[in-house]
């Protein structure tokens, strides 16, 4: 499945997984994730673990509350444990120390 269907108020969006920068748990809404793309941010009533199982080929767990699309990863700051995503690295996401090796290996293997 290459798309996520999102309903936002009275509109329905078909969002391509490759357009997603990252997905994180919503800071204020329980059982809701926040999906961030270049153009917009969407809230979806969904479990992060289920999204990881469905889209694990494209999205990688970087923290217990966040999945990232490594295709959009521009740089990794090892000291601050931050991933910079987006066209110019505008989006900053924290990663867990124990996930660094997995993230860096997958990122460096991309495009081979």
What does each model-found stretch correspond to?
Residues 1-112:
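Basic, polyanion-interacting recognition surfaces, primarily
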């Amino acid at each position: 499945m290459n798309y996520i269907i999102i309903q936002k108020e009275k509109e329905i969006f078909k969002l391509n997984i490759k357009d997603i920068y990252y997905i994180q748990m919503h800071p204020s809404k329980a059982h809701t994730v926040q999906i961030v793309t270049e153009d917009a941010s969407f809230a979806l009533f969904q479990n992060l673990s289920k999204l990881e199982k469905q889209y694990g080929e494209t999205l990688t767990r970087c923290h217990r509350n966040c999945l990232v699309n490594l295709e959009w990863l521009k740089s990794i700051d090892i000291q601050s444990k931050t991933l910079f995503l987006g066209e110019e690295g505008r989006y900053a996401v924290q990663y867990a120390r124990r996930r660094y090796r997995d993230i860096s290996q997958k990122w460096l293997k991309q495009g081979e």
